[in-house]
């Protein structure tokens, strides 16, 4: 037998991996300077003998210096200088520590290319002076300088100023040696003629017309005499400056409209610090229509446009050359404003063939005007076959409607655009016949649909063969959907072929084209559903009821080896048809595969007789939404007796990071939740939160769902634009929902967009508006929410990064779990 197979398999893969790791460390060690050790991200030089005399540099063609994030140097008495080019190669450097060494001098530009540097520790060195110019471009979190023999001079007064104005290095006891060689606390240091500079501009605001020129003057003062410079940011217009001691001027010529709203700053800087004064530049210019496109259909018809102008242009629409008087049926909507740019649309509510025609937009302000025209076609005239009669006039430009009210389609006898009365009569008869035929067809289709719904009742799990995995509706323990590579025929209609029971009626759900059926081969090969004896289940009381059946609190015996009995939640199956049983077993297999500390645990099934039973972990405190409301500022309104303790910020962060952990797991298993909300999370002992529900939430939280076409239920307040508009559900759409869950947590369970109707919510979300920051929410968490609510799915934050950020915030704020009593 060939020995070759012995070099394959997991064992050999691990061996090769170990060899590569050892090789990497060996290669790194060869590139290290003497007395130093290196890894791919770290350099440390702590051996005093023989020690180093210069800042450590890596050998060429060895470790990539850009990957080094930390350098530690200690006990190097012969290291005295950091030159300008010593650190420039370490562009990824975050932490620099040089302690108990001989460092005396740091070049001004030593850290010029180290923009990622956050922590510097120069404790117990030989520094006698250190300029703020070393660090002014860095966003440092820590600068530790204790134990250095600083000389009391104006050169170090900036450290005193820093202590007085910033958090770091205020915890340090810094001293300097005075002329008598005595240690003087830096906090008490007084140096004559050594203070902060000042900068003053003539005016805080500046308004100028496009194409003109302007000069901005600035005066500075201070002792030591400051240097004056201008910070113009990304100014587009041509500019030049002149400075002389305490005066400076900035000349801007041929000013561009692109510079409107920008800030220009005059900066004065000396040894002690800096001061600046800023002016806001406003540029006035004539309007231009930069974008006008054919109408698009969403929840309303929209003719999109973009207009630039300052002051804000007045907008006027014309329809077929006549002024269009706006009304509730047709009006201008501005969706996004960016100082001088306005993005919006002419919104039309259910336009007909009567609204077909030419639409002209005119934008006008005191500096000029601009206009553009677009032809719009919404639908053909009823009763006309354009394929057989292509020459028939599609758009009749006479005033069949009055522009003041697009909804008024009353014809006036003297305005009929035809001179042939007989032809007009024939067309009217044709229209009547068409309406009768259409009405008959619609009535027949409705009758067929009712019969199909009557005959095609599905199981409580809302699944049909391999096309569904775990139902999106309330009939399963968790509305999860698995992504796989099987085949399925997607349905794009409002009433998809699948039907699930919500409440007491069958409701069709939309089949999602992005996800396909899972095959048996994709289940884990070791999937084993635990079967529980019926005599081991003792019902205690009813917890609730959904369309699938009832949920009970129960005691289950012999389930865990370490406990004689435990409390569980059992879900019963009311429908005992063959299809329901097949779906029941399939869901049980899938739930068995979902094992995570923040997913409600599925114990197994009981199939001895009827009803069929699923056994789940019991979560003592119920769903998270009720829990949040019961522990919020309004709890006193709902509580009987003493109101519960209000949740703290740290406890809310603890809840949030647990939900994020569960979502990370679901994403790793290629599951999309599609209905993540606090109502679908459960709370147990010691503030333990898990994702999962028992199919009752849509009865209790019916106002959280929006009926589409009278049937389909969608949680639109938790859905991103692509899910609302295109029924597209992905891990990224779950990230959006997670952002809304964070908002729910920090508002103590308020309904998102509670002040708006469902239609208004759809409009807000599709137009790019987001929820406001809750009063109790830290800015870091709100920025995380905004990262979840990016319009483009690929720009949203990664679910793993969200979990890591929440974990770090939660660790920084210890949690006290006595809230549950």
Swiss-Prot record:
Where exactly is the site Interaction with SH2D1A?
705
Q: What is the protein's quaternary organization?
A: Exists in a dynamic equilibrium between monomeric (low affinity) and dimeric (high affinity) structures. Interacts (phosphorylated upon activation by BDNF) with SHC1; mediates SHC1 phosphorylation and activation. Interacts (phosphorylated upon activation by BDNF) with PLCG1 and/or PLCG2; mediates PLCG1 phosphorylation and activation. Interacts with SH2B1 and SH2B2. Interacts with NGFR; may regulate the ligand specificity of the receptor. Interacts with SORCS2; this interaction is important for normal targeting to post-synaptic densities in response to high-frequency stimulation.
The entry's localization annotation reads: Cell membrane; Endosome membrane; Early endosome membrane; Cell projection, Axon
Expression by tissue, per the entry, reads: Widely expressed in the central and peripheral nervous system. The different forms are differentially expressed in various cell types. Isoform T2 is primarily expressed in neurons.
What does changing residue 705 to F do?
Answer: Loss of autophosphorylation
Instruction: Output this protein's name.
Output: BDNF/NT-3 growth factors receptor
Q: Where is the composition biased (Polar residues)?
A: 484-494
Q: Where is this site: Interaction with SHC1?
A: 515
Please tell me whether the keyword Nucleotide-binding is annotated for this protein.
yes
**Residue ranges, annotated region (Interaction with MAPK8IP3/JIP3):** 454-465
Domain Ig-like C2-type intervals: 197-282, 295-365
The residue ranges for the Cytoplasmic side of the membrane come to 454-821
Q: Where is the LRRCT domain?
A: 148-196
Site residues by UniProt (Interaction with PLCG1): 816
Q: What is the lineage of its organism?
A: Eukaryota, Metazoa, Chordata, Craniata, Vertebrata
Where do the LRRNT domain residues begin and end?
A: 32-61
Q: Which domain of life is it from?
A: Eukaryota
- Record keywords: ATP-binding, Cell membrane, Cell projection, Cytoplasm, Developmental protein, Differentiation, Disulfide bond, Endosome, Glycoprotein, Immunoglobulin domain, Kinase, Leucine-rich repeat, Membrane, Neurogenesis, Nucleotide-binding, Phosphoprotein, Receptor, Repeat, Signal, Synapse, Transferase, Transmembrane, Transmembrane helix, Tyrosine-protein kinase, Ubl conjugation
Listed binding positions for ATP are 543-551, 571
- The cysteines joined by S-S bonds are 32-38, 36-45, 152-176, 154-194, 218-266, 302-345
A single Gene Ontology MF term assigned here is: brain-derived neurotrophic factor receptor activity
Q: Which residues form the active site?
A: 675
Report domain Protein kinase positions: 537-806
């Amino acid at each position: 037998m060939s020995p070759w197979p012995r070099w394959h398999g997991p064992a050999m893969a691990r061996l090769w991996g170990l060899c590569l790791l050892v090789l990497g460390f060996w290669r790194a060690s060869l590139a290290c300077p003497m007395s130093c050790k290196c890894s791919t991200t770290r350099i440390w030089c702590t051996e005093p003998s023989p020690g180093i005399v210069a800042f450590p540099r890596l050998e060429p063609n060895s470790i990539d210096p850009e990957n080094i994030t930390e350098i530690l140097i200690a006990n190097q008495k012969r290291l005295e200088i950091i030159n300008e080019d010593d650190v420039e190669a370490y562009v990824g450097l975050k932490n620099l520590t040089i302690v108990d060494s001989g460092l005396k001098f740091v070049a001004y530009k030593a850290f010029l290319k180290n923009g990622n540097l956050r922590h510097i520790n120069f404790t117990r060195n030989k520094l006698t002076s250190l300029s703020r110019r070393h660090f002014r471009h860095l966003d440092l979190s820590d600068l530790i300088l204790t134990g250095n023999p600083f000389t009391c001079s104006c050169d170090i007064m900036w450290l005193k100023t820093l202590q007085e104005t910033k958090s770091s290095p205020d915890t340090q006891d810094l001293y300097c040696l005075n002329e008598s060689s005595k240690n003087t606390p830096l906090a008490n240091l007084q140096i004559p003629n050594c203070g902060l500079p000042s900068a003053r501009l003539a005016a805080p605001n500046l308004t100028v017309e496009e194409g003109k020129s302007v000069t901005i003057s600035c005066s500075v003062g201070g002792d030591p005499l400051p240097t004056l410079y201008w910070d113009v940011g990304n100014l587009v217009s041509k500019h030049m400056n002149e400075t002389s001691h305490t005066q400076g001027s900035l000349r801007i010529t041929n000013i561009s409209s692109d510079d409107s709203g920008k800030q220009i700053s005059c900066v004065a800087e000396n040894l002690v610090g800096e001061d600046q004064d800023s002016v806001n530049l406003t540029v006035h210019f004539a309007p231009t229509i930069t974008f006008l496109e054919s109408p698009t259909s969403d929840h309303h018809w929209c003719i999109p446009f973009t207009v630039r102008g300052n002051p804000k242009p007045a907008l006027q629409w014309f329809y077929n050359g006549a002024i269009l008087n706006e009304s509730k049926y047709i009006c201008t909507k501005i969706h996004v404003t960016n100082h001088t740019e306005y993005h919006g649309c002419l919104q039309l509510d259910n336009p007909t063939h009567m609204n077909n025609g030419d639409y002209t937009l005119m934008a006008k302000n005191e500096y000029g005007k601009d206009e553009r025209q677009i032809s719009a076609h919404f639908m053909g005239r009823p009763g006309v076959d354009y394929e057989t009669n292509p020459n028939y006039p599609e758009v009749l430009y006479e005033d069949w409607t009055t522009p003041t009210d697009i909804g008024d389609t009353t014809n006036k006898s003297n305005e009929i655009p035809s001179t042939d009365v007989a032809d007009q009569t024939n067309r009217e008869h044709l229209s009547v016949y068409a309406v009768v035929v259409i009405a008959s067809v619609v009535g027949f289709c409705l009758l067929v649909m009712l019969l199909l719904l009557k005959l095609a009742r599905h199981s409580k799990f809302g699944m049909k063969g391999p096309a569904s995995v775990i139902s999106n509706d309330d009939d399963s323990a968790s509305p999860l959907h698995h992504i796989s590579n099987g085949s399925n025929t997607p349905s794009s209609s409002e009433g998809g072929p699948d039907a699930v029971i919500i409440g007491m009626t069958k409701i069709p759900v939309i089949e999602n084209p992005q996800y396909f059926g899972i095959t048996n081969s994709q289940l884990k090969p070791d999937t084993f559903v635990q079967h529980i004896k019926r005599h081991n289940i003792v019902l205690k009381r009813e917890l609730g009821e959904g369309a699938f059946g009832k949920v009970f609190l129960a005691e289950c015996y012999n389930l865990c080896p370490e406990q004689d009995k435990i409390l569980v939640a059992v879900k019963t199956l009311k429908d005992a048809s063959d299809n329901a049983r097949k779906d029941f077993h399939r869901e049980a297999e899938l739930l068995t595969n979902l094992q995570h500390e923040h997913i409600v645990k599925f114990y197994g099934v009981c199939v001895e007789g009827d009803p069929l039973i699923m056994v789940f972990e019991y979560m003592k405190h119920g769903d998270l939404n009720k829990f949040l409301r019961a522990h919020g500022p309004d709890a006193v309104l709902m509580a009987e007796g003493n109101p519960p303790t209000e949740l703290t910020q740290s406890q809310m962060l603890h809840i949030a990071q647990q939900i994020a952990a569960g979502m990370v797991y679901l994403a790793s298993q290629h599951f999309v939740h599609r209905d993540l909300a606090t109502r679908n999370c459960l709370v147990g002992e010691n503030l333990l939160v898990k994702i999962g529900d028992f199919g009752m939430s849509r009865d209790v939280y019916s106002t959280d769902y929006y009926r589409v076409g009278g049937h389909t239920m969608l949680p639109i307040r938790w859905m991103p634009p692509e899910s609302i508009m295109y029924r597209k559900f992905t891990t990224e759409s779950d990230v959006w929902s997670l952002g809304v869950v964070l908002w729910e947590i920090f508002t103590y369970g308020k309904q998102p967009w509670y002040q708006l109707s469902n239609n208004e919510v759809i409009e807000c979300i599709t137009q790019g508006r987001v929820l406001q920051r809750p009063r109790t929410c830290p800015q870091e968490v709100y920025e995380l929410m905004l990262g979840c609510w990016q319009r483009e799915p690929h720009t949203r934050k990664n679910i793993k990064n969200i979990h890591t950020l929440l974990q770090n915030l939660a660790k920084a704020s210890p949690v006290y779990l006595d809230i549950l009593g």
